Amino acid sequence: MTQAFFFLLLVSLVASTLSKEFNFCPRAIDEVCPVKEKRNECCSSKECRFGEMCCSEPCGNVCRVKSDTPLGFPAKEDSNCKVGEIKKKWYQKVWSKITKWG
């Protein structure tokens, strides 16, 4: 009798764990990008491994393990997104020089 009870308890625990939806990005590792150049590891969650999703972080898009709480931001699927180094536009370079002086 006790073996059947523990078996049912184990099955229900596993079922409840597997049914939980993990569809959120975890909190970003850095609040501000510590490196000069940004780099995209992914542009869509389809480019990430199973159990991961493409998340937007200060240094670019990265594949992160899914979370059950919405602490981070998913990457916007954009046709202009390219994997690799993100080149700054001319006005972004000007703005970074202005803010460096101020």
UniProtKB/Swiss-Prot annotation:
Residues 20-39 form a propeptide. The keyword DNA repair does not apply. One of its GO terms (molecular function) is toxin activity. Transmembrane segments: none annotated. The modification Tryptophan amide is found at residue 101. Keywords: Amidation, Disulfide bond, Secreted, Signal, Toxin. The keyword DNA damage does not apply. Contains 5 disulfide bonds. GO terms for cellular component: extracellular region. Residues 1-19 form the signal peptide. Expressed by the venom gland. Belongs to the venom protein 11 family. 02 (wap-2) subfamily. This is U7-agatoxin-Ao1a. It comes from Agelena orientalis.
